[in-house]
Amino acid sequence: MGALVDAREINGSDLIAALHLSQRAPGLLGKGADKSAGTAEEYGQIEQLFLACLRTGDDQSAQTCLDRLSHRFGPSNERVMGLQGLYQEATAKDRSALEKCLADYDKILSENAVNVPILKRRVALLRSLNRTSDAITALIQLLDAIPTDAEAWCELADLYQAEGLGAQAIFSLEEALLIAPNAWNIHARLGEILYVGASSSDGARLASKSVQHFCRSIELCDDYLRGFYGLALASSRLLSPDYETPSNSTAPSKQTAERLHRFALQRLRDIVQSRSVDDQHWASSRSELIAAQALLNRFEQSS
């Protein structure tokens, strides 16, 4: 079976890109008559195609992808079991059906408590059922078993933040960075949570740390729009009249904050301008580009 599709296309998070890919699913899957053949990369692409089809409601093609993976790796393969669970969740008609999925996960975990894909599906399902405290408990149990899962630490941070537990969210992301210190997206996410917390009594210190993490994010990825967006916001907080520079010597001065702010805005302008005329970038990050332009407009109006 030949290569199905460019990996950059199937990894796109935008719904339009997913829809475009899923519409091609019947033709792409039809090329793979020999279900036992194929490279690991091609089966990874089938998995991404499966996710795109589920996201766009093409359940039939998603089932075909799942059958292909199950035939190749076996239905007892943990990754396949996780995808099967995702399919059952996505096609569930009501809450009762979702509760049945949860019961199925509990049964699987009673036989193998460290089935990671099922553990993660269970967490995701608890979140979708608005059982946030149960999801937090489940994630803590997962991390007790696998403390080096940076993705799980990040998800735990999101749950804590949703519950208004900012300190716990910050701790969770700091743990994630111990595992993945060069993950620019995690640095940016930590910067965002610190920025949100900067309205507290400890605001000066948190705002300063927020700027530091956004700077690290764009140092690691020099065209990361989210990092520059956050740096523009966080540096503006340091420039506000009511901000007092903390005694902490690592806090940037007003002059440094001003330079960082101007730099972030200029890079945002450059990124928005270049990506807005690129169809591929526009399709995959339209919402981010619109938000960045809105932020630029806001600062221009206030200057």
Task: Give the predicted meaning of each segment.
Residues 1-35, 39-42, 184, 190-303:
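Eukaryotic alpha-helical solenoid repeat scaffolds
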Residues 45, 78-81, 117-118, 152, ...:
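TPR alpha-solenoid repeat register
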Residues 48-49, 84, 122, 156, ...:
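Structural register within alpha-helical repeat arrays
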Residues 50-53, 88-89, 126, 160, ...:
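Residue at a conserved register position within TPR or TPR-like alpha-solenoid repeats
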Residues 55-56, 91-95, 129, 163, ...:
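Structural motif corresponding to the intra-repeat A-B loop/turn of tetratricopeptide repeats
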Residues 69, 107-108, 141-142, 175-176, ...:
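Canonical positions in the second alpha-helix
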